[in-house]
UniProtKB/Swiss-Prot annotation:
ATP binds at residues 32, 35, 116, 159, 162, 165, 168. Its cofactor is Mg(2+). The lineage of its organism: Bacteria, Bacillati, Bacillota, Bacilli, Lactobacillales. HAMAP family: CCA_bact_type3. InterPro entries: Bact_CCA-adding_enz_type3_sf (IPR050264), CCA-adding_enz_C (IPR032810), CCA-adding_enz_firmicutes (IPR023068), NT_sf (IPR043519), PolA_pol_head_dom (IPR002646), PolyA_RNA-bd (IPR032828). A single active site specifically recognizes both ATP and CTP and is responsible for their addition. CTP binds at residues 32, 35, 116, 159, 162, 165, 168. GO terms for biological process: RNA repair; tRNA 3'-terminal CCA addition. This is CCA-adding enzyme. GO terms for molecular function: ATP binding; CCA tRNA nucleotidyltransferase activity; magnesium ion binding; tRNA binding.
Length: 401
């Protein structure tokens, strides 16, 4: 099969392949860029595999970087763009369920493609668009099937993360997982507990953003994959899956906030869940801010909304995902639009001014007064006017005395 209209990313990289070929080596585009082009999806970068060994690649191109030379990868810099060229290779045993103990460079494309995870990812393409399909990946693509290359049990034993990748591709592409591949996933799911949490999280986040995330979550639950994922156990995924049947999160922060909004975790358990998944501080901060409001949106006050203003987009999206009433979302949107200030710095008076006017001196009381002023302005008790705020501060200090 030949692709007649190549994306620009391939066209830009064609000189790299032809230079390798002119020197007597084989060179192909491989991996996700070929798969996604066949599926009509946008690609962002390309991967190149070649029979040239790393030192041979470096001798051909003047501007190179050893990005992973021990695994056969050299980056070639061409007109400001970096292209990773990886030597055809075979891999040894995987004692850590992640990386091969060692790799051996070979001259055979078939031997290289044999080690890849799924048939849809084991396609190679010549510089002119001719696609080489040694493992029926095109047929599996046509059928909408995710099938391991060769022995599924062997592929998943080599790298347990491939099980999460199977579920992720199912979510992203809407493909079914082939029966033998699915059986191996069920049998070897316990090995997921041996994989670094960060690697599992990246795949799970991609799954959650897939158009068929609900389908993949149902598979993961049915096959008890969830039992080997990090964090306190979520007893009931049904409402999460129902939500994702209707819509998807636009980013992984929203995805996590959505999941945790649908659990009955208390604050401590929610924090433990995020810690176990090794989420970033920014994600934790966002989730902790908006989940309490999503749990009780009708009871949220103007000041509650003001306090999470920095996360308003995430809040409104999670409210929509969880099926909050339109009038509830409209009310919160209206509160956001009508807020007199968006942050304390918007107040028309400062701590320095209160000190210079003699109303206050530096100390804890100053901080309390500024907090009181901020609250009063936000809820509409006073206007954000300098004189009004100064008067409010004086009265508050007098009351305290």
């Amino acid at each position: 099969m030949k692709i007649t209209q190549l994306p620009q990313e391939f066209i830009d990289a064609q000189p790299i392949l032809t230079k390798l070929e002119d020197a007597g080596f084989e060179a192909y585009f491989v991996g996700g860029s070929v798969r996604d082009t066949m599926l009509g999806k946008t690609i962002h970068d390309v991967d190149i595999a070649s029979s040239a060994f790393p030192e041979e690649v470096k001798s051909l191109f003047h501007n190179t970087v050893d990005t992973g030379i021990q695994h056969g990868t050299v980056m070639v810099l061409d007109h400001g763009t970096g292209y990773e060229i990886t030597t055809f290779r075979v891999e040894s045993t995987y004692t850590d369920f992640r990386r091969p103990d060692h790799v051996t460079f070979v001259r055979s494309l078939e031997e290289d493609l044999k080690r890849r995870d799924f048939t849809i990812n084991a396609l190679a393409m010549r510089h002119d668009g001719e696609v080489l399909d040694l493992f029926d990946g095109l047929e599996d693509m046509k059928k909408g099937v995710i099938r391991a290359v060769g022995d599924a049990e062997k592929r998943f034993t080599e790298d347990a993360l491939r099980m999460m990748r199977a579920l992720r591709f199912s979510a992203q592409l809407g493909f079914n997982i082939e029966a033998d591949t699915q059986k191996a996933l069920v049998d070897l799911a316990p090995n997921l507990a041996k994989i670094a949490v960060e690697r599992v999280r990246v795949e799970f986040e991609k799954l959650l953003l897939g158009s068929q995330a609900s389908q993949s979550l149902e598979l993961a639950l049915r096959d008890q994959v969830m039992n080997y994922l990090p964090g306190p156990h979520i007893e009931d995924w049904s409402s999460i899956i129902d939500d994702l049947n209707k819509d998807q999160a636009t980013n992984y922060t929203v995805a996590w906030a959505h999941i945790l909004s649908r659990t009955q975790f208390d604050d401590k358990k929610r924090r433990q869940f995020m810690y176990d998944w090794k989420m970033s501080r920014n994600v934790m901060k966002t989730v902790n801010a908006i989940v309490p409001i999503v749990h009780n949106p009708k009871k949220s006050t103007v000041f509650d909304i003001y306090q999470v203003l920095a996360y308003q987009e995430e809040l409104l999206e999670v409210l929509s995902l969880t099926g909050s009433q339109p009038e509830t979302i409209q009310r919160i949107s209206h509160i956001i639009e009508m807020l007199p200030i968006t942050k304390a710095a918007d107040l028309n008076i400062s701590g320095g001014e209160l000190i210079r006017s003699g109303i206050l001196t530096p100390g804890p009381l100053l901080g309390r007064v500024l907090k009181k002023i901020e609250y009063a302005v936000v809820v509409g008790d006073i206007l954000n006017d300098h004189d009004a705020l100064e008067k409010f501060a004086k009265e508050y200090v007098n009351d305290q005395n």
